[in-house]
Amino acid sequence: MKLNKILKNAFLVTVACLVLSACATSKKSGQMQGDVYTGNDTVEYLASGVPDRVFFATNESVLTTASRETLRKQATWLRKNSKITIVLEGHADERGTREYNLALGERRANAAKDYLMTYGISSDRISVLSYGKERPVDSGSNPLAWSKNRRSVTVKAN
C-alpha cells in the first residue's frame, strides 16, 4: 500500500514536471538577501515587488521570520486579487533520498499554505505540489546552491 502511494506520487510529480517544463520561461538572475530570494525567475512572478519564494534551513519545514513576512505580503496581494489561485511548490536540496525530499518539499509547501490560511486565504485557492530535489534552481553541489534549493515557490495558477 505504501509502495503504491510512493509510485502514485512519483507519477504525479513526473506529469507535473512535464506540464510545467512545457511552460517554462527564460530565467532571470536574482540574488539572496538574507533568506529572501529577490529574483523573478518562476513561470509567472506572483506580483511586482512581492517575493515569490521562501527559504528553509536544512531538513526543516519551519518558517523563518523573513519567510513569514514574505508570505504576509503574498497574503495581502492575494486578498486584493481574490480570483487568483496559486500553487505552492515545495523543493529540497540534492542531499537525501528522492522519497525523503519529496516528503520534505510537501511539508515546506504545506507550511507556507498553513501560514497563508491564517491570513484568510481559502485553502480552495491554494494547491500544494512537491518537487523534492528534482527541480533545483542552482545545480551546484555546495552550501550556497543548497540554500537556494531549500524553498517553497508561489506560482500563480490562473
Describe each model-derived feature in a short phrase:
Residues 2-11:
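Bacterial N-terminal signal peptides that target proteins for export
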Residues 139-142:
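Short beta-alpha junctions and helix-cap segments that line functional grooves
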Residues 83-91, 106-137, 150-158:
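A non-catalytic structural micro-motif
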Residues 24-85:
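Periplasmic peptidoglycan-binding/tethering modules of Gram-negative envelope proteins
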Residues 144-148:
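A generic structural micro-feature
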Residues 19-22:
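C-terminal motif of bacterial Sec signal peptides marking the signal peptidase cleavage site
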Residues 66-73, 99, 107, 111, ...:
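Extracytoplasmic/secreted proteins, especially bacterial periplasmic and envelope-associated proteins
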Residues 16:
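Pyridoxal 5′-phosphate
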